[in-house]
């Protein structure tokens, strides 16, 4: 449970992580501002308070929340694809991660948060409103259906996907939503290196790049082997993908 007088160490952990991120090339100036850290702390308070009545997250200790939700969400700060993106879709956002921390940092970019679980997404919408984030929209929809929707298909400059599934599956969820020339950031652990080989066919069929850039961020999350797997989109996704709801997870490419 979140306590209003949470130990100062929680804020210190957050400030230390934000200071590391602020040193990155192309990191926005706002990341070093007190008001941004205040926004993240308020987001944590909102999540943990609501988590007492609705299951939003299994991470309930504030120190772990700072590390595994807030700082982990911000691992992509300073990367060129994020810097140039204007429209971003967060696939399987749940209660708003990584979308909300990034939307608060980049108010000039538009974020669409999608999820198949209505209650979590309703909370994300509530949190966005509470935090004054007018650059966030939410949509209750399965990823497969979103990828076949003409208003969403190949619309976004960047797709984010965190803690949703294995690479062969989530590649089919995300690549159809991204325009040619765009990219997908998959938040994974280095244990996913085996999944990378398994997802080669999916990338080939869906228009993704053969080469995948992997960025470790152990400096941001000491002791955690987390990484971003970055896939560029080189070609248009064939009309046959994504397949119908439930098929990608049952029969991965």
Please annotate each region the language model reported.
Residues 47, 102, 124, 188, ...:
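Residue-level signal for inorganic ion chemistry
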Residues 181-191:
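Conserved beta-strand signature within the Rossmann-like core of class I S-adenosyl-L-methionine
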Residues 106, 178-180:
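Helix-to-beta-strand junctions that scaffold the AdoMet/dcAdoMet cofactor pocket
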Residues 1-84, 89, 119, 126-136:
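Class I SAM-dependent transferase core
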Residues 144, 189-194:
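Short "lid" loop at the C-terminus of a central beta-strand within the Rossmann-like core
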Residues 200-253:
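SAM/dcSAM-binding transferase cores
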Residues 63, 74-165, 171:
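Conserved SAM/SAH cofactor-binding pocket of Class I
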